[in-house]
Every structure is written in structure tokens, then in C-alpha cells.
Amino acid sequence: MDRVEEFTGRRVFYVEGVPDPTGGWAGFFAGHFRALREDAWRCADEQHVRTCPQYDAIVVGLPQYVFYGDTRNPIINLLAATTVARAWRGKPLLRPGGAMVLITACDGHIDPDLHPSYREALRLFAATRRAGAVEAHFERLRAQPRYLDMYRNHHAYHPVHPLWLLNESQYVLEQAGLLVFASGERNEGVEAVGATYAADFRRAWDMVLAHCGPSPRTLVLPSYFSLVPMVFDVDATRR
């Protein structure tokens, strides 16, 4: 905004709206952007920042659609896990080596019309569970004629779109010692993204207890993706 004012030679009158967690409005702020910034950010923090300890385990419920598509898609599930695990400041929300459980309808289906390059990217990723293995094929994926045609003429995602998602999702695979997709259907896509399948939550919870020990400190987020996202201010010394 400083550059805008420098270019125009005028002060900018700015209006900022802060949503509440349900998608309504918590407040509106108007004036010069510097003058309203502190009050607007304080309001946003009051609405969306939660102070909490660090957790041994996190359980998250997924809706049918989130971000870029259907949660039947294993890459979309991995991105959802990463989004929650990265929503922190101070210290990581999930302790190193902790466990995450997604309650999801993931059955391995990848929409070939919307995400034509995802299945190939997932196959490349599965070999090492490292995004770099897919990046090595960047130019080939980017220039693949069928993928480009789908992107340019049929409303599909860009051929290299899954590379971006796998890159950022590397975080949860490195932070969590156990990632479980519970419910849905057993499918090879779950293992390909580095997760473990459980037929239901009871079986998933047994895996968590075996991994973390009895009475793990657990954060349960049944409707995280149905609300305006939260940020967790983590105090790792808090008990």
C-alpha cells in the first residue's frame, strides 16, 4: 500500500472487514491503512487465534469437498492434513513424531477431468514420498500435450498443480510419525501419500494408542474446514 500511495501521490482510504469463525462479520474498520491495521489485526486474533499446548495427536473431520476438489482424492487429503498441522505460531501444533487421524471418505478416486496429471504425480511421489521425485519430472509434466489441452480448453487444473501441493504437504509427513485416513475405502492412494488406512475411527484410535502410548494429549477438530480457519498459538511448555 505504501507503493500505491507513492505512485498516486494520494493517501488511500481503506475498508477492512474481519470475518467471525462462522463466516459472519466480527467487525469493519475504515480509514488510512496504517491507522486501522492494529485494531483490525487485534480483532482477527480475538476471533481466530486459539492458545493451546502442543499435542501428541490430532483428529480432523473432512467435508466432502475442500480446497481443490473431492476428499475422495488422496492428495487432497494429504493437503488437508498439512493445512491443520501448519496452522500454528510459536511452536508446532503437533509434536515431532505425533499422530494425525483424518475422518474422510477417501477411496482413491482422482477426477480425470479436473485433475488429469494427479495420478501420474502420485505414482512418482509414491516411490520415495519426497516431492523432489516429482519435481524431477516438472518439464515433462508441464509440456504433456493432453494435460495442457485439458487445462487450456476443458477447465482442468494445470499439469504441475500437484507438485505444489506435494511440496507443501511434505511438512506433515516429516512432522507426524503416523498419519491415518479413517473410514473411506482401502485404496493404494492412501499408502502412496504416506498414510495408513483404517476402516473406522476405533481402529484408527488403536493405532494412535499403539504409536503414542496411553492417554495422548489430543486435539479433536470435527468441523475445522466448515469454519473460517483457526490459527493455534502453541505453548509447548503448557500442560
Residue positions per predicted region:
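Conserved, well-structured core segments that form the ligand-binding/active-site neighborhood
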Residues: 1-56, 61-64, 81-94
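Short, glycine-/Ser/Thr-/acidic-enriched flexible segments
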Residues: 20, 63-66, 106-109, 185-187, ...
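Acidic/glycine-enriched edge-of-secondary-structure segments
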Residues: 23-35, 68-74, 151-154, 182-195
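Short glycine/threonine-rich loop-to-helix capping motif typified by GTGT followed
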Residues: 27-28, 68-77, 110-122, 192-193, ...
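Structural motif
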Residues: 56-61, 101, 219-220
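N-terminal glycine-/serine-/threonine-rich phosphate-binding loop
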Residues: 74, 80-81, 199-202
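C-terminal catalytic subdomain
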Residues: 78-179
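Extended hydrophobic packing segments that form well-structured cores
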Residues: 167-239
